[in-house]
């Protein structure tokens, strides 16, 4: 996946969210494929959390669907589910929720370990001109 400014913003905000929840330790990546964008471990409980970012354009891609399915089905050695956080723009949250139901990742009885984190996308900032530059 490309590292567009939107995706970088989503990733930073999702990492901040995981840190607030106590998943502050960066886990060493293993040689499993595919590799999640974010892997964190709670230093207190030792629980693993995965994180992925999803853009509007990703919602229709088969590769995104496969990644979401793969990471939502991952288990620890002791067969407990791994928490999975998906960072998405606020405007795209309903579409992602519908996709998760369509892929049978979340429903009324399953998918409690999959958490959608809506993130406000920042507006593009304009560079201010100083009074000196305006005078020419």
Language model features: what each stretch is:
Residues 9-12, 61-71, 99-101:
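Well-ordered, non-membrane alpha-helical segments in soluble/globular domains
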Residues 81-89:
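Acidic beta-strand-to-loop metal/phosphate-binding motif
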